[in-house]
Swiss-Prot record:
Catalytic activity: L-seryl-[protein] + ATP = O-phospho-L-seryl-[protein] + ADP + H(+); L-threonyl-[protein] + ATP = O-phospho-L-threonyl-[protein] + ADP + H(+)
Keywords: ATP-binding, Cell membrane, Kinase, Lipoprotein, Membrane, Nucleotide-binding, Palmitate, Phosphoprotein, Plant defense, Serine/threonine-protein kinase, Transferase
Residues annotated to bind ATP: 81-89, 103
The protein, known as: Probable serine/threonine-protein kinase PBL22
Membrane topology classification: Lipid-anchor
Protein's organism: Arabidopsis thaliana (Mouse-ear cress)
Modified residues (Phosphoserine): 235
Function: May be involved in plant defense signaling.
EC number(s) reported in the record: 2.7.11.1
Length: 381
């Protein structure tokens, strides 16, 4: 039996046999029995064509509650960098000097023991440049804490919505770069792992950013193993965030990897429009982003009405048209008609590269015009 050695059923702690867990932790048992890609492996999870044996907490360190209290100055309110139904996230500094983000789960919150276990299992097995790195965890009494690498720029929603007066809006290129990073993270879960993993909680709040605006997907407590063998979907209780859930999943609990594609389409719409998936402060008819955008998505002549005014027209119209066309495909009500994530990655890599070229040309033109104006001003004297 493989288990978290720090967890003990004789106290308030948990002891976990990963071979009998449900949800994503079923990966341990499912992956040892099934290899739908035909390699014949029976000893673990296929990641990038190689077998990974699930070892919960494998690369993650077990922290004491005292260590994490010291790192956050006793969970001082001034150290809080995020809050939600799950609890609070604190900025902390470990004894080694490493700056980290520490998520303290609320015992009465939305994220319970099961989701905690799923997240530790998942981030201990799966590693990718676009997935957040789990440094460690703590299970002391009723306390459940997760320790992640610190992302200095916060989440995507911090840079799209309710900006401070002195805050610079994201450029078009940066938005497309973020779309590429998020898509690559999803591609890893869908295509590089066997069986596939359905993220189930893709939203702007879970897209973290470093100083270069490179993406790290976070919060995997709701992740689910995708359908295997001849199964077309997974039937499960509806979880996730309202406004991002695919219609077939929200209505019937039928979950597939295409459910993530729909959620990605909502994020794309947020990137393009600068609007929230749900914003009850908007007038009636504009509160639900997808419903508001539908008429514009179907008419290329109205694409411009979707664009965030803060972009001030500083983007290639051709790149905008491409991005909106793909967004519309991702938001198709019919799951089977949504694109594969691999195709989405290729498309947005192209859009991002073209957007960068456009931005570079625009900057060069601006510099040339500025130099010419300076020369003309000097000559006039």
């Amino acid at each position: 039996m493989r288990c978290f050695s720090c967890l003990n059923t004789q106290t308030n702690d948990m002891r976990i046999n990963i071979d009998t867990l449900s949800d994503l932790t079923d990966y341990a048992s499912v992956a040892t029995k099934i290899d739908p890609r035909g390699t014949g492996s029976k000893s673990g999870i296929l990641v990038n064509g190689k077998v990974n044996s699930p070892k919960p907490g494998g690369g993650a360190r077990s922290f004491t509650f005292k260590e994490l209290a010291a790192a956050t100055k006793n969970f001082r309110e001034g150290n809080i960098i995020g809050k939600g139904g799950f609890g609070s996230v604190y900025k902390g500094r470990l004894d080694s000097g490493q700056v980290v983000a520490i998520k303290q789960l609320n015992p009465d919150g939305h994220q319970g023991n099961q989701e905690f276990i799923v997240e530790v299992c998942m981030l201990s097995v799966f590693h990718h440049p676009n997935l957040v790195t789990l440094i460690g965890y703590c299970t002391s009494g009723a306390q459940r804490l997760l320790v992640y690498e610190y992302m200095p720029m916060g989440s995507l929603e911090d840079h799209l919505f309710d900006l401070e007066p002195d805050q610079t809006p994201l450029s078009w290129y940066t938005r497309m770069k973020i779309a590429v990073g998020a898509a690559r993270g999803i591609e890893y879960l869908h295509c590089k792992i066997s069986p596939s993993v359905i993220y189930r909680d893709l939203k702007s709040a879970n897209i973290l950013l470093d100083k270069e605006f490179s993406v790290k997907l976070s919060d995997f407590g709701l992740a689910k193993v995708g359908p295997v063998g001849n199964r077309t979907h997974v039937s499960t209780r509806v979880m996730g965030t309202y406004g991002y859930c695919a219609p077939e999943y929200a209505m019937s609990g039928r979950l597939t990897i295409k459910s993530d594609i729909y959620s990605f389409g909502v994020v794309l719409l947020e990137l393009i429009s600068g609007r929230k998936a749900i914003d009850l402060s908007k007038p009636n008819g504009e509160q639900y982003l997808v419903a508001w955008a539908r008429p514009y998505l179907k008419d290329p002549k109205k694409f411009g009405l979707l664009v965030d005014p803060l972009l001030r027209g500083k983007f290639s119209k051709r790149c905008l048209n491409y991005a909106i066309s793909i967004t519309e495909m991702c938001l198709n009500d019919e799951a089977n008609h949504r694109p594969k994530i691999g195709d989405v990655v290729v498309a947005f890599e192209y859009i991002a590269s073209q957007s960068k070229s456009y931005e570079d040309r625009r900057t060069a033109r601006k510099s040339t015009d500025s130099n010419r104006l300076r020369r003309e001003t000097k000559q006039s004297y």
